[in-house]
Amino acid sequence: MSTVKRILLINGPNLNLLGLREPGHYGHHTLAQLVADLTVKATNLSVTLDHIQSNAEHELIDAIHQAHGNVDFIIINPAAFTHTSVAIRDALLGVAIPFIEVHLSNVHAREPFRHHSYLSDKAVGVICGLGPDGYEFALNAAVRRLQSES
């Protein structure tokens, strides 16, 4: 009997403002809608999806640390921490859980400071610019990867 795989969805700073903040870049979906839709899809794919959103870097790092031994895959939208956080990078490397980096907007079509990611070279993959669909694509890719490892 196989165990149900667990995926942790991490959303970084200001993503709690989805639906309000710069809808031209981020769309009109709220974070609650995005997580609810993804949770249904995860259930249909027979995996468990846990979620955290925080504007505090240390809370995201703590969640990554707590994922060790409890989570099989991470989907992370580090938001602004993408471009600044060596600490989140080190946490992900420390727990050695595979992860996909997701961004709602195309970070490469935006300000130059958004072009660099401290995570992308260590990610299984990076999805950007596809809005909420990017999360679904990441979920499907994570599940396929976990199934291929079983």
Curated annotation (Swiss-Prot):
For this chain, one GO molecular function annotation is: 3-dehydroquinate dehydratase activity
Task: Fetch the SUPFAM superfamilies from UniProt.
Answer: Type II 3-dehydroquinate dehydratase (SSF52304)
**What keywords tag this UniProt record?**
Amino-acid biosynthesis, Aromatic amino acid biosynthesis, Lyase
Identify the EC number(s). Answer: 4.2.1.10
Enumerate the PROSITE patterns for this protein: DEHYDROQUINASE_II
Q: In which pathway does it act?
A: Metabolic intermediate biosynthesis; chorismate biosynthesis; chorismate from D-erythrose 4-phosphate and phosphoenolpyruvate: step 3/7
GO BP annotation list: amino acid biosynthetic process; aromatic amino acid family biosynthetic process; chorismate biosynthetic process; quinate catabolic process
Active site at which residues? 26 (proton acceptor), 103 (proton donor)
Show which residues form the site (Transition state stabilizer). Answer: 21
The EC class name is lyase
Q: Which residues bind substrate?
A: 77, 83, 90, 104-105, 114
The reaction(s) annotated as catalysed by this protein in its Swiss-Prot or TrEMBL entry are: 3-dehydroquinate = 3-dehydroshikimate + H2O
Q: How does it assemble?
A: Homododecamer.
PANTHER family annotated for this entry? CATABOLIC 3-DEHYDROQUINASE
Report the sequence similarity comment from the record: Belongs to the type-II 3-dehydroquinase family.
State its role.
Catalyzes a trans-dehydration via an enolate intermediate.
Q: What is this protein called?
A: 3-dehydroquinate dehydratase
Organism equals Photobacterium profundum (strain SS9)
Underlying gene: aroQ
